[in-house]
Amino acid sequence: MDSPALGAVALLLAGFWHLGLTATNYNCDGALVSTLPSSAFTSSSEFFSTHSPSFAKLNRRDGAGGWSPLDSNEQQWLQVDLGDRVEIVGVATQGRYGSSDWVTSYTLMFSDTGRNWKQYRKDDTVWVFTGNSNADSVVHHKLLHSMKARFLRFVPLKWNVGGHIGLRVEVFGCSYKSDIADFDGRSSLLYRFNQKLMSTFKDVVSLKFKSMQEDGVLFHGEGQRGDYITLELQKGKLSLHINLGDSNLHFTNSHTSVTLGSLLDDQHWHSVLIERFNKQVNFTVDKHTQHFRTKGDSDHLDIDYELSFGGIPVPGKPGTFQRKNFHGCIENLYYNGVNIIDLAKRRKPQIYTGNVTFSCSEPQIVPITFVSSSRSYLLLPGTPQIDGLSVSFQFRTWNKDGLLLSTELSENSGSLLVYLHGGRLTLLIQKVAEDPVEISEGTNLHDGLWHSLNINARRHRITLTLDNNAATASHATTVSRIYSGNSYYFGGCPDNFTDSQCLNPITAFQGCMRLIFIDNQPKDLILVQQGSLGNFSDLHIDLCDIKDRCLPNYCEHGGKCSQSWTTFYCDCNDTSYMGATCHNSIYEQSCEAYRHQGKTSDFFYIDSDGSGPLGPLRVFCNITEDKIWTAVQHNNTGLTRVQGAGPEKPYTMSFNYNSSAEQLEAVINSAEYCEQEAAYHCKKSRLLNTPNGIPFAWWVGRANEKHLYWGGSLPGIQQCACGLEESCLDMRYFCNCDADREEWTNDTGLLAFKDHLPVTQIVITDTNRSNSEAAWKIGPLHCYGDRQFWNAASFNTEASYLHFPTFHAEVSADISFFFKTTSLSGVFLENLGMKDFIRVEIRSPKEITFSIDVGNGPTEATVQSPTPLNDNQWHYVRAERNLKQTSLQVDNLPKKVLEAPAEGHFRLQLNSQLFVGGTASRQKGFLGCIRSLHLNGQKLDLEERAKMTPGVKPGCPGHCSSYGNLCHNGGKCVEKYNGYSCDCTSSAYEGPFCKEEVSALFEAGTSITYIFQEPYPVTKNASTSSSAIYADAITSKENIAFSFLTAHAPSLLLYINTYFHEYLAVILSKNGSLQVRYKLSKDGLLIFTIDSGNFANREMHHVKINREGRELIIQVDQVIKLKHNFSEIDFKAIKSLTLGKVTDSLPLDPEVSKANAYGFTGCMSSVWYNHVAPLKAALRHPSIAPVTVKGSLTESSCSSLMETDVNTATTIYSSSDPFGKTDEREPLTNAVRSDSAVIGGVIAVVIFIIFCIIAIMSRFLYQHKQAHRSSQTKEKEYPENLESSFKADIDLQNTVSECKREYFI
C-alpha cells in the first residue's frame, strides 16, 4: 500500500479513536427537567402567579397547567437551569393544559452561565422548531447535534392565533463530564516528555476552548532541528503552524501554515481536532475541516523536552512568554491519547503548571445585538449638566456604515455624533453658529472583531481613544465647553424621531455592543431587558448574534468573499467566472459553441465543464465549413534531434500542455474524434522491433500508461502505419525505421485512440550506435466535434420522460438547455426531495417558470416573452439558484432575478431521480425537443438514454429554422443530423458563415475574364422558354456587388459585354468619381456619375448596382447615390465579365478605353454578378471554372492594405492551416542541423531555378497555343460537389491544355 493510502487509513482510525474517546454516554436520552426544583425555572414574565414558569414541566397540570407570559410577543422566553453542564440531545413541548394557549414554533438558546446566550443552529442557520397544534399533544425533537450547556431557553416565535403563548417542556440528555483548565493570560501548562526527544510519525491533538480575547497561543512544541508545531488564535481565527525539519532546511522552505475558523473570541466553546500521519494533516475547527500536506521532505515531527499549553515560555526566564498567552478555558485536552489536564489535576511530575485553575471562571458580560438597519436603537440615561463627558463601549460589526452614538449635550453645548463611515470612525460635535468639530480614527473597523471606543471630554478638549491605544488617541478643541447629555442613543434613533436629542446622518448600526459605560458608570443591560432602565427597539439582549457569512466561503472558483451584517458578496475579478457567487464561466464549453455565436478561427478559452471545478483552457479553434477543430498546444511541437541515447541512458521528453490532466481529459471526452501526429525520422535508429520484444521507443499517454504502438497503428498492436498497410521498406518488419538503414526514413501517422490521448512523454533508446540518429515530432492535440452541443432527444408523448440520477446541488445549481416545441405547456425537468423540489417548465406559450423550494416555501422565477415560444424554433433556457439569488434567463430576454432570504434554510435536499421531459406522476409532460442539457456543468447524454426509452427518440431535426440567419451574404443553411452548415456556393464570400471576404491584389495588367454560356441561337428574339442552361446569359437584370481599394484614377473596375456589342462598364474617371456606363444599341451611351468625392483615396469602398427591368439603383458605401428609370432597356445575351484590364479587342467608348489603358491597380474583394462570383472562381476553382486570368493576381486581404501604399503592396498572402501536416521523409533542416541538411538546401535551390525556367517556357507555349485554339467546345461532366452555378456556366475545352485559365510563376 502506498504512503497516501496508509495516511488515509491511519487518519480514519485516529478519527474513530477520537470519537470513542470523547463519547460520554451512549444511552444519553434521560429526562432532565422532571426532577428539577421550582427555582430552576425563570421567564421573561408571567401572566399570573398560577402561570409561573415553575408549572412548565411536561404533562403536569399544576397551577394553570403551564407557563404563560404577561404579553404574547417575540420578546418572551422560558429558561431552565439544569443544575450543571449536561449533554442535551432532544426536547419536547406541550401547550398549557386545557387551554387555547400553545406555541406553534420556537427557537432554542443555551449558555453555561445564564449570560451571553447562543442560538441553536443547523447549517449555520438559526433552527426553528415546529411546536404544537393543540394544548395537550407532545411534540418531540431530536437534535441533529447535541448541546453541552447548563442553561436552556425556549423562545416562542409564533403561537395559536386564537390564544396566547402557553408552554410545558421537557429536555432529554445526560450528564457531561469533562476536564477543564482556566488560563488567565499569564500562565501555561508544560508537559515534559520522559525522554529528551519525542519523534512521531503520527499525532492526534484534540481539545475544546473558550477564549476571552482574539489572540493567544493554545499549544506549542519545538525541536533543535527546526521542527515545531504551534496552534494559536490570531484575530479570532485559529492558525496551525507546522514544520517537519530536515537536513536541507537551509535550502527549502518547509514551513506550513493553515488558518481556519472565525469569531472564535465569542466566549463560547469551540472544538479542535488535529490529525497528522507523516505529511498528511487534517485540521478541524468546529464543523470545518481542511486537508493539507506539509512542505519539505521529512515525515516525522521531532519535539525536544516538552509541549507548552496556553503560552510559549522563554527558557531561563520564568513568567516571560514569546507571544501573547491564551486567556480562557481549555477542556478535554488530549495529546496522542494523553489527558493533559487530568495529569495536571493529579499533579503528575511531568506536568508543570503556572497560575492555572481547574474550573472555568467567566466574566458576566452582557452583549446586545442591533438587528434592524432602520429600527434598532438603545436609549440609556446619562447624568446631565456634568462638566465634561465620558462614554466608552465595545462594538463589532461587518457593516462599513452605521450610527454608534448620538446625544444632545447639556447647556446648549451642541450635539455629539459617533458613527462608522467606510469602515472608519468619525466623531462629530456640531452646534449652531459654530464650526463643527470632527475627529476621524481607524480603518477597517468593520472586520467583525471587537473594538473598544473611549470618549473623554473636559472643558473645551475632547479625546477619542480607539482599541485602548493611548499612543494613537486623537484630540480636538471646541469653542464651547462640553457638558454631559441627558439621553444617549446607541445604534440608531426611534422611528419618526425629529427631536434634536437624536440625530442620524447615516444608516442605523447593525452589530453587537457590550461593556457600555456612561459618566464612568457601567450600564446593566439586563435591567434594560426587564424594562426598568432606558428603552430599546429591535434588540437581542444578552447575546451577540454575529455570523461570519464567509465561513465557509461560498464564493466559487477562487472568488474573494466580503460581507455585511445581512449578506455576503463575491469579487470574481481574475477568476474567469461571473455571477453572484462566481459560479458561471465567462467562457464557452467548446469551439462548437463559439462557432454557434458566429465566431471565426482564433485562439479562445474553453471551459469544458462550465461551472464545474475545472478551470478554462486556452485552445485554437479552427472553425471551417465542415469541421470545427480544437487544437491544444504543448511545449515542444517542433522536430527534435536525438543522439547518444541507449537503454542505460534513455532520452526522455515530457510534454506540458499548460493545463491539468483533468482539463485535457474533459476536452477529449467531449469531442467526437481526437488525434495527435507522431513522427519518427530515423537513420540507423530502430523504433519498435527488438529481439526480446521490448521496443526501442515508446510513448506515455493518459493515466501514465506506456504504449507500444506508433502513429497510424492501433492499440495493442506493436506496429507502425506501414505495418498495417503492408508497405514498410522491409516487409520483415512492421515499421520503416526497424529496417535499420543508413539513410533517412520515417514512420509518421496519427494516434487517434481517445482513451490513450494526450501524449505526455516520449522515450527513445536507440541512437547511441555509430552513425545513428533520430528526430521526433509530436504534434498538438487536435479534436473536433462537440458530443453534447447537438445532443438531443425528442419527446413524443406526455407520459414519456428520461430519468437520470439525483441532481446533487445543495448550495449551487445551474441548469441550461435548448428546447423547441409546438405544445402549449409541459415540464422540462423535475427533481423532488422529502419537501424540497426543483422544476423548470413552460406554463404557456409565452411563459417559462423556474420553481424551487429549499425548505422556506416555493420560490418561482418567471420570464414572460413578448412572442410565443412554442414556434418550433430553438430557444435557450438557463435557470440558476445559489445562496444569494434565484434567476431565470430565456434567450436574450431580460433575466428574472429573485433575491434569496438572508436567513432560513439554504441547502437543497433532493432524493428522487431526475426526470427530463416529464414528471414522476407522468402528467404535464413535455412534447418537443430538448438538447444540450447541462446541470452544474455536467453534460447529460440525452441521446444515449433515449435509445432505450419508449416514447423518446434520439436526436432532433430542423436546426436551420433557428440558425439559418447565421449564414450571411447569400449562403444557404444545410441541415445535418448533429447541427447545420452554411453552403457558400451561391455567395461571393466564404468561411463557415459566408462572411469571410475573397479578395486579391491587381496590377495594371491584371485581367480576370469570366465567360458565360453562349445562347443558342444567338438572336435578340430568343424565346424566353429556352433551356435553363442559358438563363445566366439572357437575363435582363443586373445584381452587381463588389468592394475595391485603389490610389489610381482613371481605372477600369468592371466590364460586361454582350453578344450584341452592348456593354456595361464601371470606371473611375480621372478626378476619382465613379461612373456606371451603359452602351445600348437603341439608346446609345448612358452615363451615370457618382461625384461625391475621390474614390481613389486608398480607402475601401463598397459598390452595389441593381437593375430590375427599367429601374436602376446605385449604392456606394451603404448609401443610395442614384435612382433611374429607363424608358426601355434590353440588356441580354451576356458574353463575358471582366475585372481589371480588358485584353480582347472590343468596341469601347473613349472614356472606357482611356480607363482600360491604365487597367486597375489595387485590391478588389467579394465580386458578385447575379449568382456568379468571378473573383472567387478565379481564386478557388481555376481548373474547372470558365475563367481566364492574365497578369499578376495575388490573393490578399484588402482590409490589411488600407494603411499601406497600394503601389508597393507586394506581400503575398498566405492562408496557413494551423493543422497542416507535412509528409516529409526526412527531418526539417531547421530542426536537424547536419551536413546533409546543408547539401539538401543547395539541391533545393537548384531544383527551384530549373522549375522557374520550365514555367517561363510553358507560359510562352501556352500563349501561342491559346491564340490558335479551336472555337469549338465540348461539354464536360463535372464533379457532383461542384457549385451548381458553375455547372450551368462552365465551358471547357476537350483537354486540360486548352483550359482558359492562364498561370504565371
Swiss-Prot record:
The EGF-like domain, residue ranges: 546-583, 957-995
Domain spans labelled F5/8 type C: 23-174
One Gene Ontology term from the biological process aspect of the record: cell adhesion
Fibrinogen C-terminal domain residues: 584-790
Residue ranges annotated for the Laminin G-like domain, each copy included: 180-360, 367-544, 791-956, 1017-1198
Keyword Disulfide bond assigned: yes
Transmembrane segments: 1237-1257
Family matches, as InterPro entries: ConA-like_dom_sf, EGF-like_dom, FA58C, Fibrinogen-like_C, Fibrinogen_a/b/g_C_dom, Galactose-bd-like_sf, Laminin_G, Neurexin-related_CASP
Record's subcellular location: Membrane
Extracellular side: 23-1236
A GO-annotated cellular component: membrane
Predominant cellular place of this UniProt entry's protein: membrane
Cytoplasmic side: 1258-1305
Bridged cysteine pairs (disulfide): C329-C360, C512-C544, C550-C561, C555-C570, C572-C582, C929-C956, C960-C973, C967-C982, C984-C994, C1163-C1198
Membrane topology: Single-pass type I membrane protein
Key word Disulfide bond present: yes
Signal peptide boundaries: 1-22
Keywords tagged on the record: Cell adhesion, Disulfide bond, EGF-like domain, Membrane, Repeat, Signal, Transmembrane, Transmembrane helix
Function: May play a role in the correct development and proper functioning of the peripheral and central nervous system and be involved in cell adhesion and intercellular communication.
Record's protein name: Contactin-associated protein-like 5
Organism, as annotated: Gallus gallus (Chicken)
Lineage: Eukaryota, Metazoa, Chordata, Craniata, Vertebrata
Name of the gene encoding the protein in the UniProt record: CNTNAP5
